[in-house]
């Protein structure tokens, strides 16, 4: 262990502007000052020793004049002083003065004040000198019988530490602590004693647990947690003990402490794969999610449930708990609800889908009754998508779901209404038996639709699937109702002119008597010349869309009118009725064309919309069989092809996902019989407690051995040259929210380098946690220095700096070696993610930062280039493989990723292969990146620029 890594128990801030006191003045204050002066002097002595000063002349002064004082502040400071002061001579022998200190320790261990006793015992845990501890052992033992629990629990800790470091001083410690544990009543004392037995003498700990296994539920939560840890470790090391302790774990699932329940459930899952055990653990997790108020806890426990689901055998057990899992939806947090719905959808089966749909329908109705909120709208979207997926997987449920969801087509939130419309479109195409019901409900809500986008979709569905005369007539009636009085231009001009006519003045509310200051009545008019503005008038929806200049809906309406008119002609034999219906449809199109080229709309009609409406007029005037087939057959086939491709893509992704799951046991694996297995072979699973401890300490072992390129050596950055007096290289270890730089510093000179300091600075969203300590390097010596850097976002970060040092015996200024810059790889923080096309488009429209990267590569194949970019940026391609397959000379794809900080990154790849330049021509085009923050967009662009120049492998 290097000097920089030595454990430091006490950190004291030193004011930089204060002048260090002299040893003489300190000695004078310690000898002759009052208690306050001695306290201040002792503080200064402690700070100076921490800064490297020796001050050997003050040791005896402190023993003579400060140690006998009974002031509690002095006693606290003395504990710090004795911890840091050198206690041995250079040759390792104990200083003679420490015998006097040892006597003071003994007196403090017998002090009537329990705080002084307890803090002294805690201090003894830090002592590494057996000669100091040996005379104190009787006093430490006596503290086990003190009346106050604070003293007893610290006595246990002291005995445990001394036994671990110097077993010969107290060889009977396990037996002593076992006897203490049997008679002890205080929970914290029992916890410390039991913890010691676990690590010092596990057999005694098990014996004690066996005697009180039925009373475990009555213990305090801190002791219960230690018991869970012991059972896990014992059963992990010796699986034959599982039957002995599994009942205890079952009992601890009923503990009043959430932490104990969580640990017990996790332990139960690792100890047993029996359905009853899995069900009990899952039920415990669900209760924790519902009862805990902290959303982070809910998400962590939900992840444990999702992990359980990944196991095929456990998945069947969890399917019976779907309704219990849905109770979690009572949580208002959107992320928790999202994970819960996804989990429920993964677990739903034909046995419980009906109950699931009932619950989700109730939740949808609830969202309509609560006050509008951004999360409410998003939650409604999640519910709609879940019901959509249920209906596709279980067609029998669609009839129950459709009537409830179609009410939301008139919702003011366009995103939720769009999800409903997408579901209705798929349902009406897939389920022939539901078409009448859907058309009927669509006609009911048609007039109330507020969004033009939803209106267009509803028009398309009605035009495509109205197959009876009555339905077709109903559609025409609804369109006329939604369009209002025609011709539109004339009626609008009349309204404009009517606003200026005095005779059309309208009466306002009841007249009140108004009295002036003079006491006379004021004159009032019962008429008002002001009329409501256009925006205040209640316009029919379609008329409103057209007057606002949105003529794309008019083109959609023209197509719908053409479809239903052609269908009406085929259904009705009477020529007069045929002509009447077709003429009405053509009149509506003509009046819309007239409106588009006149002044009332805010924006004129576009040429594309004019062409579309004119084409529909021409089709209706001719009524050819070819046009009839195109409008009434091929349009529907296009939708059918799209839905089939979508379903196939979903099945393919599900298949890939299932293939990713690691197979626990291969068919040809040998069967392991427990009785025939050597004890050391049973530890097949990793110790979860050890893994969590390593993760907390930042020492998580990554599985890098399988990939040689992912080894630590691949992440070593050279910071200086081989010819520099100090050579340095760094290993950049990236954790989730911080970076650890492990810097190797080598003195390549024949001089001793003093105060060798690594000075670092950061650029970007990085923050240096602490300044590395100075070192002294002998000739040709080396040392490791560690520096922690906090990361707050995925912005590209740079760490730069230098190494400064003094040469021993030289009179020159400090020497400096400038280090190479360390660039932090953004890819360590970006993870592939998925989202729907609608979400992608919405984010693309919302995100304001765009970075356009020009393709500059020597890769000649479009698909190879796309795969190279995906690998380099760690993004996921959202465009289906079928859409990318084949060769046509150009390619467009959407990519998506999320950072661990919750930032979204979108990219659109638009590339082509210039045919005129021959088969060996490189790919050209550009990549557009969008993100909410500038840092993400620029960082991802830089990464693509760096990586695309590499040759495709």
From Swiss-Prot:
Q: Where are the HEAT repeats?
A: 96-131, 132-168, 240-276, 277-314, 316-353, 396-433
The answer to whether UniProt assigns keyword Cytoplasm to this entry is yes
- Superkingdom of origin: Eukaryota
Question: Sites of the modification N6-acetyllysine?
Answer: 494
Q: State if Acetylation is listed as a keyword.
A: yes
Q: Which InterPro entries match?
A: ARM-like (IPR011989), ARM-type_fold (IPR016024), Clathrin/coatomer_adapt-like_N (IPR002553), Coatomer_bsu_C (IPR011710), COPB1 (IPR016460), COPB1_appendage_platform_dom (IPR029446)
Misc remark for this entry? Brefeldin A induces dissociation from the Golgi of the beta-COP and presumably the other coatomer subunits. Important candidate gene for meat quality and growth traits in animal breeding. May also be useful for the research of muscle development mechanisms.
What this protein is called in its record is: Coatomer subunit beta
Which organism was this protein described from?
A: Sus scrofa (Pig)
Q: Which gene encodes it?
A: COPB1
């Amino acid at each position: 262990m290097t000097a920089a890594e030595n454990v430091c128990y006490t950190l004291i801030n030193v004011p930089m502007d204060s002048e260090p006191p002299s040893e003489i003045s300190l000695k004078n204050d310690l000898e002759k000052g009052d208690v306050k002066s001695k306290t201040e002097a002792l503080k200064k002595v402690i700070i100076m020793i921490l800064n490297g000063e020796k001050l050997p002349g003050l040791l005896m002064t402190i023993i003579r004049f400060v140690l006998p004082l009974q002031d509690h502040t002095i006693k606290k400071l003395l504990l710090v002083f004795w911890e840091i002061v050198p206690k041995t001579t250079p040759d390792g022998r104990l200083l003679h003065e420490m015998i006097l200190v040892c006597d003071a320790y003994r007196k403090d261990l017998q002090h009537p004040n329990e705080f002084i006793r307890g803090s002294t015992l805690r201090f003894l845990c830090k002592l590494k000198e057996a000669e100091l501890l040996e005379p104190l052992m009787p006093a430490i033992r006596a503290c086990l019988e003190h009346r106050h629990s604070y003293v007893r629990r610290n006595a246990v800790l002291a005995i445990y530490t001394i036994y671990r470091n110097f077993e010969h001083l107290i060889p009977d410690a396990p037996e002593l602590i076992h006897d203490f544990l049997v008679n002890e009543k205080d929970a914290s004392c029992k916890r410390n004693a039991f913890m010691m037995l676990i690590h010092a003498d596990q057999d005694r700990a098990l014996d004690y647990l066996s005697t009180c296994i039925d009373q475990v539920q009555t213990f305090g939560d801190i002791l219960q947690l230690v018991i869970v840890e012991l059972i896990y470790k014992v059963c992990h090391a010796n699986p034959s003990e599982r039957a002995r302790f599994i009942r205890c774990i079952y009992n601890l699932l009923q503990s009043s402490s959430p932490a104990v329940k969580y640990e017990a459930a996790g332990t139960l899952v690792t100890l047993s794969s029996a359905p009853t055990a899995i069900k009990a653990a899952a039920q415990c997790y669900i209760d924790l999610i519902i009862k805990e108020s902290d959303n982070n806890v809910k998400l962590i426990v939900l992840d444990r449930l999702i992990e359980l689901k990944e196991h095929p055998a456990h998945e069947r057990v969890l399917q019976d708990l779907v309704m219990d899992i849905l109770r979690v939806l009572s949580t208002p947090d959107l992320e928790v609800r999202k994970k819960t719905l996804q989990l429920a959808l993964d677990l739903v089966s034909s046995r419980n889908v009906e109950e699931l749909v009932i619950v989700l329908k109730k939740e949808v109705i609830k969202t309509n009754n609560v006050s509008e909120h951004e999360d409410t709208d998003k939650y409604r979207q999640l519910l709609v998508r879940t019901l959509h997926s249920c209906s596709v997987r279980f067609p029998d449920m669609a009839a129950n779901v459709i009537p409830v969801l179609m009410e939301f087509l008139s919702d003011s939130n366009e995103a939720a209404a769009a999800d409903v419309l997408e579901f209705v479109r798929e349902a009406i195409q897939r389920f022939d038996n539901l078409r009448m019901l859907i058309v009927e409900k669509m006609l009911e809500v048609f007039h109330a639709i507020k969004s033009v986008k939803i209106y267009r979709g509803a028009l398309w569905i009605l035009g495509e699937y109205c197959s009876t005369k009555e339905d077709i007539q109903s559609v025409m009636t609804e369109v006329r109702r939604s369009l209002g009085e025609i011709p539109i231009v004339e009626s609008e001009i009349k309204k404009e002119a009517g606003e200026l006519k005095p005779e059309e003045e309208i009466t306002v509310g009841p007249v009140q008597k108004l009295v002036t200051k003079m006491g006379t009545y004021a004159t009032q008019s019962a008429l008002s010349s002001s009329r409501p503005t256009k925006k205040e008038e209640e316009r029919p929806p379609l008329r409103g869309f057209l007057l606002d200049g949105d003529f794309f809906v008019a083109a959609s309406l023209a197509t719908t009118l053409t479809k239903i008119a052609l269908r009406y002609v085929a259904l009705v034999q009477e020529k007069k009725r045929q002509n009447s219906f077709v003429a009405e449809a053509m009149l509506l199109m003509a009046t819309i064309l007239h409106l588009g080229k006149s002044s009332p709309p805010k924006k004129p009609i576009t040429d594309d919309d004019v062409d579309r409406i004119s084409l529909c007029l021409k089709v209706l005037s001719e009524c050819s069989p070819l046009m009839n087939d195109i409008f009434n057959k091929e349009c529907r086939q296009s939708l059918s092809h799209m839905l089939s491709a979508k379903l196939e893509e979903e099945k393919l992704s599900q298949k890939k996902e299932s293939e990713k799951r690691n197979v626990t046991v291969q068919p040809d694996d040998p069967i392991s019989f427990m009785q025939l297995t050597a004890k050391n072979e049973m530890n097949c699973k990793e110790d979860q407690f050890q893994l969590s401890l390593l993760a907390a300490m930042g020492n998580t072992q990554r599985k890098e051995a399988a990939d040689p390129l992912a080894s630590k050596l691949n992440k070593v950055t050279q910071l200086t040259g081989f010819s520099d007096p100090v050579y340095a290289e760094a290993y950049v270890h990236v954790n989730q929210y911080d970076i650890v730089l492990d810097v190797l510093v080598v003195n390549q000179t024949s001089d001793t380098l003093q105060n060798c300091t690594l000075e670092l600075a950061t650029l970007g969203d990085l923050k240096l946690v602490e300044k590395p300590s100075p070192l002294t390097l002998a000739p040709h010596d080396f040392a490791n220095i560690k520096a922690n850097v906090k990361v707050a976002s995925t912005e590209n970060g740079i760490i730069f700096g230098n190494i400064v040092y003094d040469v021993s015996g030289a009179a020159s200024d400090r020497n400096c070696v400038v280090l190479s810059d360390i660039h932090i790889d953004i890819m360590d923080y970006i993870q592939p993610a998925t989202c729907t096309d609608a979400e992608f488009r919405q984010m693309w429209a919302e995100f304001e930062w765009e970075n356009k990267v020009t393709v500059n590569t020597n890769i000649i194949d479009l698909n190879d280039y796309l795969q190279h970019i995906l690998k380099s940026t760690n993004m996921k391609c959202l465009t289906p493989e079928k859409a990318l397959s084949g060769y046509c000379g150009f390619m467009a794809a959407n990519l998506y990723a999320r950072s661990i900080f919750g930032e979204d990154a979108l990219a659109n790849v638009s590339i082509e292969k210039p045919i005129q330049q021959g088969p060996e021509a490189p790919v050209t085009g550009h990549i557009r990146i969008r993100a909410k923050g500038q840092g993400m967009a620029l960082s991802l662009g830089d990464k693509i620029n760096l990586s695309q120049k590499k040759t495709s492998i």
